[in-house]
């Protein structure tokens, strides 16, 4: 009866996280060799919640939880589930089948085993000497070990099973889990629909798996994987994504620090600001702005530890990027521009709260894509390459000529062992990262600008979530053209550089007998007017859309309850216990006082409302006002010059007439 009551009271909590717990059905499992135990996995899906009393367990063969790879464990679990289903036992029908993903299960399982043994001993003690709920709860929380994210969730479940978790705390925890799942569901729904729609007409029963995989690989853009590796329940995928969310909050990154000199480290204190000056960094670092921005951000985001990036390989790769960016001695598309776009992308991720909704691989894709997005830029436009029938245009068939070269060359660089910064990524991680980076870099092709804006506006008008990859593409593209949205002293220097690059192309076009490309004739361009038009029709609409998509992606996270409500405070409020023996609460990322240097913070105002910073709007208006003043002066000067020329011409005519009369 006690077990039935416990199962009923925590069913919804288990369904939110698809929690796993060791079976306690036999005495041999309680006292036998732990290496020989069978793990019983209780699967509770939304459909099963109404039939919890009749739900069954899937028996998984003994697994070496200490030495066996987690992915192999997952495959073994899935195979065991299929065998169980085919034999007629376990879950009824296809709709009730769910795969068990055991990734990261090693420590939670061993923890629960220890906790179960401790729970049994505690239960025996309680039979002899009953204690009050408050005192037992205090003792339990004070003696809780310092656990990682998943283990903390397991510990909450253990407290619930043992009846030591207050009902109010349980309610808050369930509300929190539901909100997180709701946030994950928006993106997950779109992703799963994209995966399933392409081959929806070809059911698994009508063709063999091999033929279906060939169809997917040949006639769709989806990355076809083996069928058995694909989750069957959206709830399972949501639970996994929720686990990743908690893991991000709890993870204590042990970052391998890249070497950054003190004077450069001092400048890097401003790397989280929109007004950061890559020009100053380039001067102090003696031309190595890109390398040190790369070092700093790989440190801040923990990529060195998360993806096991070799320090030597990173230094070699960034140095090679700098060589490529300096190849054509461009006044604009150079090392400083690459550092600027990367730092601006970092601001978009870290200071708006967007990083909280992204995985580590997505964060790496954004920053890596920004680092390489103009590698070996020739200083000419795609249209110039097409019109001149350059080697690049021939190679890439006039399609995003430069962008294809940038991304292709940068991945080719990593074929050299001493520059392979992705050597420790799994095959699937590398494939996913490569696909995202290619999409991000190709989206910097200016010919795709209006299509990107139109697509994003359509997504913003719909109630569903935004396609995450398209959002990341637009963010990097916006940062690529964001110099008119920077402080005037930076914007003016960028304008001088880009126009000089245009003028050089115009000079080359004239020497080749080609017509001038727009803004490339140094004798006719009106600088102020060109920048006003660029701001009005390109940059400002892009930044407005960016602000709207950031709000839509981050706003769901604001509705999460205070993270310290996950764990009840000590009964007596004492602090005599060692911190290492107490459960620490989730970091409150919504706190407006959170350090701006944090890459995972949600900007809120004093009223607790989402307040995403948009400093670019202020600078856009200021810079446009500067250009309007300059345009007025240029127009006045032009009129004076034209009047002087007209007066000189009239005077010449008069002189000619006088000379003619005198001659006659």
From Swiss-Prot:
Interacts with cmd-1 in the presence of Ca(2+). SMART domains: HDc. It comes from Caenorhabditis elegans. A divalent metal cation 2 binds at residue 374. Its cofactor is a divalent metal cation. The active site is at residue 333. Residues 24-60, 113-142, 564-597, 630-664 are annotated as: Disordered. Keywords: Calmodulin-binding, cGMP, Hydrolase, Metal-binding. The keyword Metal-binding applies. Its EC number is 3.1.4.17. Expressed in AFD thermosensory neurons. A divalent metal cation 1 binds at residues 337, 373-374, 480. GO terms for molecular function: 3',5'-cyclic-AMP phosphodiesterase activity; 3',5'-cyclic-GMP phosphodiesterase activity; calmodulin binding; calmodulin-activated 3',5'-cyclic-GMP phosphodiesterase activity; calmodulin-activated dual specificity 3',5'-cyclic-GMP, 3',5'-cyclic-AMP phosphodiesterase activity; metal ion binding. Residues 28-38, 114-130, 630-644 have a biased composition (Basic and acidic residues). This is Probable 3',5'-cyclic phosphodiesterase pde-1. Belongs to the cyclic nucleotide phosphodiesterase family. It catalyses: a nucleoside 3',5'-cyclic phosphate + H2O = a nucleoside 5'-phosphate + H(+).
